[in-house]
Curated annotation (Swiss-Prot):
NCBIfam families: 16S rRNA (cytosine(1402)-N(4))-methyltransferase RsmH (TIGR00006). Its EC number is 2.1.1.199. Keywords: Cytoplasm, Methyltransferase, rRNA processing, S-adenosyl-L-methionine, Transferase. It is found in: Cytoplasm. Pfam families: Methyltransf_5. One of its GO terms (biological process) is rRNA base methylation. Its main location: cytoplasm. It comes from Campylobacter jejuni subsp. doylei (strain ATCC BAA-1458 / RM4099 / 269.97). InterPro entries: RsmH, SAM-dep_MeTrfase_MraW_recog, SAM-dependent_MTases_sf. One of its GO terms (molecular function) is rRNA (cytosine-N4-)-methyltransferase activity. S-adenosyl-L-methionine binds at G33, G34, H35, D52, F79, D98, Q105. It catalyses: cytidine(1402) in 16S rRNA + S-adenosyl-L-methionine = N(4)-methylcytidine(1402) in 16S rRNA + S-adenosyl-L-homocysteine + H(+). This is Ribosomal RNA small subunit methyltransferase H. GO terms for cellular component: cytoplasm. The gene is rsmH.
Length: 310
């Protein structure tokens, strides 16, 4: 079986979860099963719940992981909703979310993620109603400007939005190739990534509501208050990493009083656990040589030791 995607930070993921023995493991973003396959092999006492919103990826992984069929349950869902759908929440001992786009999605022309694609789609869940085509051709100039500024952190977001609106007034933009030509190949000051790449990334985030999905997922976990469970999240965008970092920081605090208050009044017992990774973990030099797409990957991990399940 030809594997269409290389899992990032595989050794680092194994290290984070190396002490897990029994219970349930939730792979929130199964993809093509690389992380789960390795963990299934190394942790025979664990049962797995594998989730992905991409039907193609899910079908592939079902075949890839068929030897573990008695230990794994598959669910098609966005990872922000999967915790609502599963049982055995109290037995969760490990949770992994790799929230990047897979190589298969990037390289598949029909999915419309690549700047070279003949399509304009970018939906991770192909049943979703809004695609990149709708965003590019139907959003107002103000909406596009906001997307490019907030998600792409582009200084000339207004100018790019204006160019898109001008071109689509002549003819609707039907492919990623066309969009790439409109935006141009230039780079933003002090950044190695092209403006087009940043703009495409911003559109993809909007199409899939990626930041909202991440916040919803972390918010649900905060309310769930797992116990004796390790959470690891791999992100590929500074905005996502910032969200994860801030949630972990919040969860690790015992005192939640306003900083202006001189003496604690909250009880000083609100911590959900400890941050495992003092700083984000990035790909090794060896991995970068084998898989250049791992260059943006950052992993952070948190241990929920909420023994009283407050």
């Amino acid at each position: 079986m030809e594997i269409p995607h290389i899992p990032v930070l595989l050794n680092e993921v194994q290290e984070i979860f190396k002490n897990l023995k029994t219970g349930y493991f939730l792979d929130c973003t199964l993809g093509f099963g690389g992380h789960s396959e390795t963990l299934l092999k190394n942790h025979p006492g664990l049962k797995f719940i594998a989730c992905d919103q991409d039907q193609q990826a899910l079908e592939f992984s079902k075949k890839r992981l068929k030897d573990f069929h008695n230990r794994i349950t598959f669910i098609q869902s966005n990872f922000s909703e999967v915790l609502e759908k599963i049982s055995h929440k109290e037995e969760l001992r490990g949770i992994l979310a790799d929230i990047g786009v897979s190589s298969f999605q990037l390289d598949n022309n029909e999915r419309g993620f690549s700047v070279n694609s003949d399509f304009l789609d970018m939906r991770m869940n192909q049943n979703s109603k809004i695609s990149a085509y709708e965003v590019v051709n139907a959003y107002t100039k103000e909406q596009l400007t906001s997307i490019f500024k907030d998600y792409g952190e582009l200084h000339d977001a207004h100018f790019i939005a204006e160019k898109i609106c001008l071109e689509r007034s002549k003819n609707l933009i039907k492919s990623a190739k066309e969009l790439y030509q409109i935006i141009g190949k230039g780079k933003q000051n002090h950044r190695k990534i092209s403006k087009a790449t940043l703009a495409f990334q911003a559109i993809r985030i909007e199409v899939n509501q990626e930041l909202k999905v991440l916040k919803d997922f972390l918010g649900y976990l905060e309310n769930l208050k797992p116990k004796n469970c390790i959470l690891a999240i791999i992100s590929f965008h500074s905005l996502e990493d910032r969200i994860v970092k801030n949630f972990f920081k919040k969860w690790s605090k015992n005192c939640i009083c306003d900083e202006k208050i001189m003496r604690c009044k909250c009880g000083n017992n609100h911590s959900l656990g400890q941050i495992i990774t003092k700083k984000s973990i990035s790909a090794s030099k060896e991995e970068l040589l084998k898989n250049s797409r791992s260059s943006c990957a950052k992993m952070r991990a948190f241990y929920f030791n909420n023994l009283d399940n407050k």
